């Protein structure tokens, strides 16, 4: 079954991504350039085979956010699948196709909003499932027992929390590793990037929590530098703001 028409990568989309990426994902300028290089062959339909990209590095550095932003620019929601869940027979039916009316990956592909796919923690699935994706990565065709789906001009992003290329090769194996068009490392955040993330999150939340305390904000920014990633920084700020708000409600001594 052929795909419905999806927005293609255009020069305008490339320009917008280049200009605005750093507002969405802080501290990953190198990754931005490599992402743009990777998707460029799709500009204005030059290439019909999907571009398959592996994003690796610690969690909370912007891998998922990068894919979400790309999907927004391509007109809708990301098709996101959590591969760490694919560990049993039920998963085999989902990936390879079970009964015709049973929920399957092929059906989800047909129902997707955009041509941007995210396979989160791709390395965590049982390795037997990787073989189901060889043809999709090579030719843009996904075939199970019931459906044949043509997925032309797609951007397929896989994520992994491994730290090095050698680890990825060892755990994923060469048959799938060699099918990636681009392998992009997301680096650990610098102190400046962490402060910037904290600053942005403070601005986003301070009105909701009715907090305007410069001294507190400066302390939070200093504390942010000791955190590992954006997720931890956001938790730190939310927890701190919640505590301050509770103290206002309950009185200083009650919390």
Positions of PLM-derived features:
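Walker A/P-loop
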Residues: 47-81
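Conserved RecA-like P-loop NTPase ATPase core
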Residues: 27, 35, 64, 95, ...
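C-terminal alpha-helical "lid" subdomain
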Residues: 72, 80-81, 174-178, 187-255
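Hydrophobic positions in the central parallel beta-sheet of the AAA+
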Residues: 81, 117-120
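AAA+/P-loop NTPase substrate/partner-engagement loops
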Residues: 73-101
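Interdomain "pre-motor" coupling segment immediately N-terminal to P-loop NTPase/helicase cores
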Residues: 1-10
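Pre-Walker A (pre-P-loop) alpha-helix and adjacent loop at the N terminus of AAA/AAA+ ATPase modules
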Residues: 11-53, 241-246
């Amino acid at each position: 079954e052929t795909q419905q028409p999806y927005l293609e990568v255009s020069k305008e989309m490339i320009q917008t991504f280049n200009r605005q990426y750093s507002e969405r994902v802080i501290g990953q300028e190198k990754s931005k350039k490599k992402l743009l290089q990777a998707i460029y062959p799709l500009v204005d339909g030059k290439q019909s085979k999907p571009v398959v990209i592996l994003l690796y590095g610690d969690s909370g550095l912007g891998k998922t956010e990068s894919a979400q932003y790309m999907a927004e620019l391509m007109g809708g929601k990301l098709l996101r699948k959590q591969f760490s869940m694919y560990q049993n027979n039920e998963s085999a039916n989902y990936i390879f196709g079970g009964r015709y009316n049973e929920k399957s990956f092929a059906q989800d592909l047909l129902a997707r909003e955009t041509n941007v796919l995210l396979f989160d923690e791709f390395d965590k699935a049982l390795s037997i499932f990787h073989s189901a994706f060889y043809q999709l990565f090579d030719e843009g065709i996904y075939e199970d027992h019931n459906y044949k789906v043509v997925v032309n001009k797609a951007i397929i992003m896989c994520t992994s929390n491994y730290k090095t290329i050698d680890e990825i090769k060892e755990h994923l194996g060469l048959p799938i590793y060699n099918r990636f068009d681009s392998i992009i490392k997301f680096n650990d955040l610098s102190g400046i990037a962490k402060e910037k993330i904290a600053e942005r999150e403070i601005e986003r939340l301070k009105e909701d929590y009715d907090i305007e305390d410069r001294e507190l904000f400066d302390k939070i920014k200093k504390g942010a530098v000791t955190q590992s990633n954006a997720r931890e920084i956001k938790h730190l700020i939310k927890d701190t703001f919640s505590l301050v708000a509770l103290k206002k409600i309950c009185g200083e001594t009650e919390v």
